[in-house]
Amino acid sequence: MMYSGKKFLLFSLLGILLGYLFHRLTLLYDSYTGNTIDKWTRLLMEGQDEVLQSPWNVSFTGKSSAFFLLGFVMMLLVYLYLETGKKQYREGVEYGSARFGTLKEKKFFYGKEFSHDTILAQDVRLTLLDKKPPQYDRNKNIAVIGGSGSGKTFRFVKPNLIQMNSSNIVVDPKDHLAEKTGKLFLEHGYQVKVLDLVNMKNSDGFNPFRYIETENDLNRMLTVYFNNTKGSGSRSDPFWDEASMTLVRALASYLVDFYNPPKTREQLIEESRLSQTEYQNLLKRQKKEVEERKKRGRYPSFAEISKLIKHLSKGENQEKSVLEILFENYAKKYGTENFTMRNWADFQNYKDKTLDSVIAVTTAKFALFNIQSVMDLTKRDTLDMKTWGKEKSMIYLVIPDNDSTFRFLSALFFSTVFQTLTRQADIDFKGQLPLHVRVYLDEFANIGEIPDFAEQTSTVRSRNMSLVPILQNIAQLQGLYKEKEAWKTILGNCDSLVYLGGNDEDTFKFMSGLLGKQTIDVRNTSRSFGQTGSGSLSHQKIARDLMTPDEVGNMKRHECLVRIANMPVFKSKKYNSTKHPNWKYLANQETDERWWNYQINPLNQRQENHLEGLKIRDLTFESSLK
């Protein structure tokens, strides 16, 4: 049992006062003459006045000391009685205190201006740009759940995009968001990029190799690719994927070094003789040179990995394949104690039929890069990801909603975005991007599996980024991130949740449980008929879901639920997008004047002038690094 320290101190002081009163009355009693009855009579009649006239007397006697202790102990006994017999009453919330939030509580999260906010519902907003007191400060991650036709794009994504208060990355599975909204962003000075996985011939280029800076980056990129290109056979036996990964790591690392050659032993010795200042200046120059080469398109591509795989085969009367010669020459120049050669050595451990099978699996794994449009899309990068946290940017990722063939590209895209912007925030901006970057993950289940996504929802928050996973039902998230119940971590890292309705029973139950229970009064009546009829009436309190699963399922089409961390749930109307002040600047159909017919071809985009006159090297005809 827990006792209150403050209350104990209070009763101790009262005990001292009561004990002192007993002490004074004892001294008065002993000072009187006469029999016992006379003394008590005088004490009761005059004792109070005499104590008040001369309150302070600390001349304790043995008898007065005993009565002082008696008064003190009596008060302590009162304290113990009250504490041990104390009952905890919470009238009206005995079985739960869940309730709907009020309009006043909604306004706690509003920003100074409407344009600073994220629109969650008609009268529910969460500030994106303004700093709030700690009790109303929430992270900006938002989970959105809604079935087909519930308004995920129309009621939530579109109105928040046209708030134009951040850089935005949005997945567009079917709504032609780029065409409908692109002109508005261009007119407001945004740089606009479109990665179109439906019509790859009309798309910006995306090459994740442009953003590779470390061996960990390379390994992570390949892991994303392999995880999102698994067939049913490789799921049952991971050996072939792991063996294939060994070969691809070696090839990819070789290509990275081909375009940005590592330092030779002689160069490392020479650098070791430099002073610390000279060495730091050298590193800055080298980093700048690497960035310049990447701007000129000097980085590998997945299609080149596919080409190198083909050079593993040997011709007639050929002792070594072209690829073996390439790696031998690499080892002569850079040694064998490096990431490239260690992976190549691991691959060479496979012999005979196992080796042939590994090559066959790897060839099949990269067969998609025989498609010309895929080769063109991934050859050169025009997305310029490192500008998104510095300049207002609008990036559309157009994905097919009925074909998962190129899901690996969307997974690679987001993995690269998180990795690149997080590193940029940490290194270039000491922790936070200058401009907020928000990612709208519409059709989240169709994007592909992003490694450590649960952790990303936590880490990007501090970098001035936010994630908005958008789901049709809770099962989509549970199915994609079921390992170690990562889906719970993802939802837990979203301080806001918007439910727009749907028709999934499991989601009804999930939302009902999330809303909690309330305490209600129940009146029971009974009546019996007969010769001696009687009746009774009783009242009791019971627990009840704030909204039962069937009530969640039967919400009106224009209603939604908004849960903000540490607040009662808000039941509100969905936002009326057509009333947004910028809605009139959007297009609705192709014949509208505001419709943006973008034409993009990354291979035809003019690069920096220093590309002119540059000799493009063909790996298939080179046997060594130059």
Model-predicted segments: where are they?
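Short alpha-helical interface patches
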Residues: 49, 54-55, 65-116, 215-225, ...
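Basic- and hydrophobic-enriched, low-structure N-terminal and domain-boundary segments
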Residues: 1-150, 154-157, 201, 517, ...
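Residue-identity detector for glycine
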Residues: 5, 15, 19, 34, ...
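P-loop NTPase motor domains
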Residues: 22, 27, 133, 138-465, ...
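Compositionally biased amphipathic helical and low-complexity segments enriched in hydrophobic
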Residues: 3, 10, 45, 121, ...
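Low-complexity, intrinsically disordered or weakly predicted helical/coil tracts enriched
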Residues: 6, 186-187, 208-211, 525, ...
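Conserved ATP-driven motor cores of ASCE-family P-loop NTPases powering translocation/secretion/packaging/pilus
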Residues: 457-561
